[in-house]
């Protein structure tokens, strides 16, 4: 009975993830999305999404050429397999990446803009004794009190590093990328029982221009992703050995991840589902341990949030506001093209900044959107395709956009300007467009193949599935999708490995 249930659950998840990846692969092969950021003479910034058809024959050809080269390289290096698997290569790669990242950060010195700048300004206000952002109805923290974890991090960095706090944050992001690479590698080893696959994933992550350029984005994205991946790895280790160290690390890392970025709740839920699924097939003691870890994660998240709120209230002298309800983001996500358009804030403002009244107004707005979709099904299909295209089909995932209009680099200005605005940036975007298709093809092949998969191998895939479903309703943005794209890299590596192994 238990075995039947496990087979049924695994098949359902496999079909759903494969279907989503197949859809995204088709989007990638036949179309692409670019983000244009323009600034007029008054300093106003306009962001627009441009949808274009891809040369599908060239995209398919690139996938085939990549597969052929992979087969050739695999054949040529078969005799040097031990060297490829050597951890020394990974250490060297990490050191090179660390030095390159430090050089990049200290060279370009890009200060934060947009929301990261607003969060850091709130931190500066707290240190200056100005707490208006928490009490003024138009204040940033009055609307978004869940950002207080990020604010406290900025407060700590400003207290230690002063005006160079933004550089310290970028160094933390650099270290976070290394943690992400290592955790994805270790999770891959647990899921596929292959050290060589884990090393390939590590190299693939640090070679991604997306992760490199995201180091300047001071919004907690990389730090939160590093923490939740650390939590997932610790959860897997706990199910194997039941050590209290893994219990504590998993609970604390989950709490920190959600505090820094609430979107990390999606991979956290995937991890919780894994724990519940695993305990159904284990012995009685292991069931108790797994369920205990689930409660431990919940407790850590609740206590962590309360602790952050308490510390913020202590520093600001103002109670934590209820803030803008999450329902407002859904209302905004279902209006227009689904990107940020001010609908969420307007609903909050028009309801008199009353959270309960804003929920009712947002729900009315949501029902209106759903009714319109039902009555105009052709429009809904177009809207659904375009919303997912602008999120998942920008191969740069906003890594170029987030670095634009942030002042001139202090060193290597011509190179950096060419990367962001010139032909070098266009070439990078085209390369990433091809790489994205290769990644999605490998991941799709893995999930559509009939080979038996361990329960551990489902965690990141279910997290990506959750991210896809969540952002069908939530505010759209390719920068929100970037973490899920990185979670697909292990499946891409394993998928291509399986495919090449069958073509010996």
Feature-to-residue mapping (PLM):
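Start-transfer (signal-anchor) and selected internal transmembrane alpha helices
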Residues: 1-103, 289-299
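Membrane-interface anchor segments at the N-terminal boundary of transmembrane helices
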Residues: 47-62, 167-168, 387-464
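Extracytoplasmic catalytic/substrate-binding loops of multi-pass membrane glycan-assembly enzymes
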Residues: 108-124, 128-164, 320-323, 360-362, ...
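Transmembrane-helix signature of polytopic, membrane-embedded enzymes
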Residues: 184-207, 455-460
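Short acidic/glycine- and proline-prone juxtamembrane loop motifs at membrane-interface regions
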Residues: 210-224
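Membrane-proximal stem/loop segments at transmembrane-domain junctions that anchor or position
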Residues: 309-409
């Amino acid at each position: 009975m238990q075995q039947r249930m496990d087979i049924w659950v695994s098949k359902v998840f496999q079909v759903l993830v494969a279907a989503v990846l197949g859809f995204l692969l088709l989007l990638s092969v036949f179309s692409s999305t670019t983000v244009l950021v323009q600034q007029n003479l008054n300093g106003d910034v306009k962001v627009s999404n441009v949808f274009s058809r891809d040369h599908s024959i060239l995209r398919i050809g690139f996938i085939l050429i990549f597969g052929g080269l992979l087969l050739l390289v695999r054949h040529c290096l078969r005799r040097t397999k031990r060297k490829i698997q050597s951890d020394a290569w990974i250490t060297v790669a990490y050191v090179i990446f660390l030095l390159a990242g430090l050089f990049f950060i200290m060279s370009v010195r890009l200060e934060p803009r947009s929301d990261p700048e607003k969060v850091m300004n709130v931190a500066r206000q707290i240190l200056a004794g100005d707490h208006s952002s928490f009490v003024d109805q138009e204040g940033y923290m009055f609307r978004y009190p869940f950002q207080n974890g990020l604010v406290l991090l900025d407060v700590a960095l400003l207290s230690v590093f002063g005006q160079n706090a933004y550089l310290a944050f970028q160094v933390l992001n650099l270290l976070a990328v290394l943690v992400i690479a290592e955790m994805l590698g270790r999770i891959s080893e647990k899921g596929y029982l292959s050290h060589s696959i884990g090393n390939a994933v590590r190299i693939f992550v640090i070679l991604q221009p997306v992760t490199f350029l995201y180091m300047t984005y001071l919004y907690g994205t990389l730090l939160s992703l590093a923490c939740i991946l650390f939590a997932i790895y610790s959860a897997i280790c706990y199910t194997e050995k039941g050590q209290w160290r893994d219990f504590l690390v998993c609970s604390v890392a989950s709490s920190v991840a959600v505090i820094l970025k609430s979107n990390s709740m999606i991979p956290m839920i995937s991890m919780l589902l894994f724990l519940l699924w695993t305990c159904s097939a284990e012995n009685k003691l292991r069931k108790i341990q797994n369920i205990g870890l689930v409660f431990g994660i919940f407790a850590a998240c609740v206590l962590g949030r309360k602790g952050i709120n308490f510390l913020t209230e202590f520093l600001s002298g103002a109670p934590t506001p209820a803030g803008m309800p999450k329902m407002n983001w859904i209302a905004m996500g279902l209006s227009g093209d689904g990107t940020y358009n001010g609908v969420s804030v307007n609903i909050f403002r028009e309801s008199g900044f009353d959270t309960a009244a804003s929920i009712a107004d947002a729900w009315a707005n949501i029902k209106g959107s759903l009714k319109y979709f039902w009555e105009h099904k052709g429009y809904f299909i177009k809207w659904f395709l375009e919303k997912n295209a602008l999120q998942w089909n920008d191969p740069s995932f906003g890594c170029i956009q987030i670095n634009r209009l942030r002042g001139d680099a202090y060193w290597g200005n011509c190179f950096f300007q060419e990367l962001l605005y010139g032909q070098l940036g266009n070439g990078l975007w085209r390369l990433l467009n091809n790489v994205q298709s290769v990644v999605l093809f490998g991941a799709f092949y893995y999930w559509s193949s009939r080979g038996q998969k361990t329960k551990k191998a489902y965690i990141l895939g279910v997290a990506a599935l959750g991210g896809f479903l969540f952002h069908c309703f939530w505010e759209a943005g390719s920068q929100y999708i970037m973490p899920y794209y990185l979670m697909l890299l292990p499946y891409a590596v394993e998928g291509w490995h399986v495919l090449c192994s069958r073509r010996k």
